[in-house]
Amino acid sequence: GDRLFIGHHGAPGLSSHAEPKRAFGKLADRFTVVTFDARGSGESDHVGPYTHEQWVADIDAIRERFGAERFVMGGGSYGGFIALEYALAHPERVEALVLRDTAARNYGEVAIRNAKARAHEFPAITDDILERIFSGTIIDNDDYRRCFAAIAPLYDVKHDPEATAKRIAATRFNYESNNYAFAVNLKSYDLRDRLHEIGVPVLITVGRHD
């Protein structure tokens, strides 16, 4: 389609364009759907700053590259944080928002509580691993790989160890992006008092098991 849709992935330093492609790719019959590896993730350069402001600026550069005055912004999980940040920074450029499994504030405590509730199913999930992920104190990329391998079953409705192992092997990890996101960005992330400023249509979806 002629209208532009930009989809932003979650999990800085872990996820990639493949995630929003799965979530939003079916809209390609109505939109030009663009997904990408955000700065510090996937095959994009692992060069900071890894701030919300920079990620918003990167989205705007993509919008400009496609020559769109306005577009539909989509994001899942942490990508939803950035979608909201973009909509508030550039309200005149957003036609609508699609938010998947996300929040307008730091939900770390809720995520940790939910993870601990299922930890008995997966013994590799320890308090130390959850603390390091959500406090942004991962040591290096090998440590990030080990931490994600422990919590990866939480991302599947039905855990498939072989599929999980393949996914981890194919992932390009960047612990610095994760650490900055959780140790710095999320400490001040709370947009609840500004949500009333968003005047475009918003579709909010959430998975029953998310």
Predicted regions and their residues:
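The feature captures the conserved acid-bearing segment of alpha/beta-hydrolase catalytic domains
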Residues: 188-199
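Conserved HGGG/HGGXW glycine-rich cap/lid loop of the alpha/beta-hydrolase fold
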Residues: 1-46, 63
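Acidic beta-to-alpha connecting loop that harbors the catalytic carboxylate
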Residues: 208-210
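Conserved hydrolase catalytic core segment
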Residues: 69-112
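Flexible "cap/lid" loop of the alpha/beta hydrolase fold
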Residues: 97-135, 177-180
